[in-house]
Amino acid sequence: MSRIIFLTTAASVLLAGAAPAAAPQFDTPAKVAYLYDLNSGAVLYAKNPDARMPPASMAKMMTTEVAFELIDKGQLSPQKMCTVRPETWQKWHAQGSTMFLSPGEQVSVDNLLKGIVTLSGNDASVVLAECIAGTEQAFTDQMNALAQRIGVRNSHFGTANGWPDNGVTYVTARDLATIARTTIEKHPKLYKQYYSLPNFTWGKTLGAGKDITQENRNPILGHVPGADGLKTGHTDEAGYGFTGSAEENGRRLIEVLAGMKSWNERVQESTRLIQWGFGAWQDKPLFGEGAKVGTAKVQLGSSSEVPLIAPRSLAVSVPAGLSSGNVQMKIHYDGPLVAPIAKGQEVAQLVVTTSDTPPQVVPLVAGDDVGRAGFFGRIWLGFKSLFGMA
């Protein structure tokens, strides 16, 4: 059963008392655009956010996310050596962006990840996929399974590198933002380690044998303050696309743009959109990290309820310069929750509504472990429920 709790704390009236302000306006020639505030959960701008489209190399974010997940679980070592199969080299050494791997070469997972993220290597993506799962097909099965687990609902991956495959691989802007958010939130150290390298050197030129250094194609890296990721994409079919992120004064935005006509348009629009997000909108704090937001009922647990905690500082996005405006908050969860529940487990959502934006949704986590009640405890809970004492 869906449970909704309306909040009447001081935070819920933090901005109360003034007439609504018009939401800031933005327009872009990009066919698809999406701007998401990670702190508030607000979608600041959306243009065709759920339209299916080919991702091109932006699919490599999901390839990287699979690797990050395995590394953080201790199931994959960055020092693991991978062999470049001659067949893989033959297919990918001159197909689009390349890391310039050599047939039979031994390459670490660490260097392959740098080749994927920084150089957009199609060859590196497939070599990593085969190294992890045995075949690219088996790896894409892992990509799709993980995508479902992290909330990617309208995308499918048929390749490890996003190369056109007659429509088997498709994504949406909203899903790409979900992948980016997951990487940033769940793997902050790996994100910082791999996604903001300005360049990477691998391979040798033919004849002279000189080192090959390629620049990171990220159009906002080094140009927008706080920019630190994520991934470009381009094919004739997809046009020019980009999923990017930047953090300014503790506030992080994620942007997705696709279907642009040129490299220059991608640079211009990705810079314009994220700068507009930082300039036209502001975050107003609601709850600090670790603050108790509310409680949720628990069924068959050692405790009848569990505190709901802010996993990070939570805020609401409002137009810049607005000192007040109507804000309503409610907690939503499917309940009662069923024990056992682990501390830190995401169990509810805080839904914040303002007069200027669509509902802003951020997660809430359990503040305590709640074990399953023992035999006699369950009998007592049943007794209380029977007589309306629960």
Q: Residue ranges of each PLM-predicted region?
A:
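Active-site-adjacent loops and short helices of periplasmic peptidoglycan-processing enzymes
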Residues: P20-P188
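Domain-terminus/edge residues, biased toward the C-terminal soluble/receptor-binding domains
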Residues: V152-H156, G167-A390
